[in-house]
């Protein structure tokens, strides 16, 4: 699973996702990709699951870029514990995603194969997404 090697602090504030993605909104590396249509949080397991779905469909051909990285920690308090007494323990990592953010890119396979692979990856993600093709193809 994806996770940062080292962080400055064990826990962090929750924060808010507001507005569209200012960076990472265009296809820069591949020819076709998946773009987020709504706010959400992608866990490292969801990112990896979608990557595996893409790789299994395109087999050995082509290259895949993952454009998001889970660098925010998710904390949880144990079940049946009263509120208060501090923040819960870290349990996993997630990537905050804003609308317009490109999540995955593919290059080196024909468009139909890439579209089918990305459609399979879309089913693994908890947010609405669309398939976008780089302009000029």
Swiss-Prot record:
InterPro entries: Ribosomal_uL16, Ribosomal_uL16_bact-type, Ribosomal_uL16_CS, Ribosomal_uL16_dom, Ribosomal_uL16_sf
A GO BP annotation: translation
Keywords, alphabetical: Ribonucleoprotein, Ribosomal protein, RNA-binding, rRNA-binding, tRNA-binding
PROSITE patterns reported for this sequence: RIBOSOMAL_L16_1
Pfam families, alphabetized: Ribosomal_L16
Superkingdom assignment: Bacteria
A single Gene Ontology CC term: cytosolic large ribosomal subunit
Signal peptide: none
Record keyword rRNA-binding present: yes
GO molecular function, one term: tRNA binding
Keyword Ribonucleoprotein (UniProt): yes
Family stated for the protein in its record: Belongs to the universal ribosomal protein uL16 family.
HAMAP family given in the database record: Ribosomal_uL16 (MF_01342)
Record text on subunit structure and interactions: Part of the 50S ribosomal subunit.
Function text: Binds 23S rRNA and is also seen to make contacts with the A and possibly P site tRNAs.
Protein name, per record: Large ribosomal subunit protein uL16
The organism of origin for this protein: Solidesulfovibrio magneticus (strain ATCC 700980 / DSM 13731 / RS-1) (Desulfovibrio magneticus)
């Amino acid at each position: 699973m994806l996770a940062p090697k080292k962080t400055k602090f064990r826990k962090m504030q929750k924060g808010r996702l507001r507005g569209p993605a200012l960076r990472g909104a265009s296809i820069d590396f591949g020819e076709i990709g998946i773009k987020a249509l709504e706010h959400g949080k992608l866990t490292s397991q969801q990112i990896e699951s979608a990557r595996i779905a893409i790789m299994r469909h395109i087999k050995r051909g082509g290259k895949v870029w993952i454009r998001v990285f889970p660098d925010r920690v998710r904390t949880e308090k144990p079940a049946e514990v009263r509120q208060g007494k501090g923040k819960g323990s870290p349990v996993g990592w997630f990537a905050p995603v804003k609308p317009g953010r490109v999540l995955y890119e593919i290059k080196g396979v024909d468009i139909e194969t890439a579209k089918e692979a990305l459609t399979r990856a879309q089913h693994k993600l908890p947010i609405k997404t669309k398939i976008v093709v780089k302009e000029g193809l």
